[in-house]
């Protein structure tokens, strides 16, 4: 299994157990980002058969049961809110950090990143109100944000990751 980690914090943010798709259905964005679909799951419904506390149950589930988004729960992502102005300042700084990283570690990616990042960020800014932003476990605002949005009538969000802000680790 491959786990994707943030290049600046080493936060685990995704794995190859999720099918990677073109971000926003746009193949041109695929060179610098990928999108995965999340699912909801039930957390805390542990029934060990010790006792039947049905008075605590609601619809057959215990009181400690909650529905969670699998990616958020598995990788301990935390939602954060940003104004459009704050996001613009963040993304400018983050893209400069990525570019510097690429110049040092992957110079063959520099031109691709310069060409493809701007349209992706423009798309995010144009549709800013449709996004929720997530941070990795370290809660470091210098790290990469994860972009979440709902596609069409889907009941769980999709998550978009900037590929050049991640590295793979095999387990």
Swiss-Prot record:
One of its GO terms (molecular function) is calcium ion binding. The keyword Cytoplasm applies. Its main location: cytoplasm. One of its GO terms (cellular component) is cytoplasm. It is found in: Cytoplasm. InterPro entries: Mss4-like_sf, Mss4/transl-control_tumour, TCTP, Translation_control_tumour_CS, Translational_control_tumour_p. Keywords: Calcium, Cytoplasm. Residues 1-171 form the TCTP domain. Seems to be one of the target of artemisinin. Involved in calcium binding and microtubule stabilization. This is Translationally-controlled tumor protein homolog. It comes from Plasmodium yoelii yoelii.
């Amino acid at each position: 299994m491959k786990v994707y980690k943030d290049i600046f914090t080493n936060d685990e943010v995704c794995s190859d157990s999720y099918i990677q798709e073109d971000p926003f259905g746009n193949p041109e964005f695929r060179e610098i980002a990928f999108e995965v679909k999340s699912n909801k799951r039930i957390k805390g419904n542990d029934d060990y058969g010790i006792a039947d506390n049905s008075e605590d149950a609601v619809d057959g589930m215990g009181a400690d049961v909650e529905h969670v988004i699998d990616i958020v729960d598995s990788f301990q992502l935390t939602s954060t809110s940003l104004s459009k102005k704050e996001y613009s300042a963040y993304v400018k700084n983050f893209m400069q950090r990525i570019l510097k990283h690429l110049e040092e570690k992957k110079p063959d990616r520099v031109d691709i990143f310069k060409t493809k990042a701007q349209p992706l960020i423009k798309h995010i800014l144009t549709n800013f109100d449709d996004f929720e932003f997530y941070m990795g476990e370290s809660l470091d605002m210098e790290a990469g944000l994860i972009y979440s949005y709902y596609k069409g009538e889907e009941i769980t969000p999709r998550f978009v990751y900037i590929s050049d802000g991640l590295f793979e680790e095999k387990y």
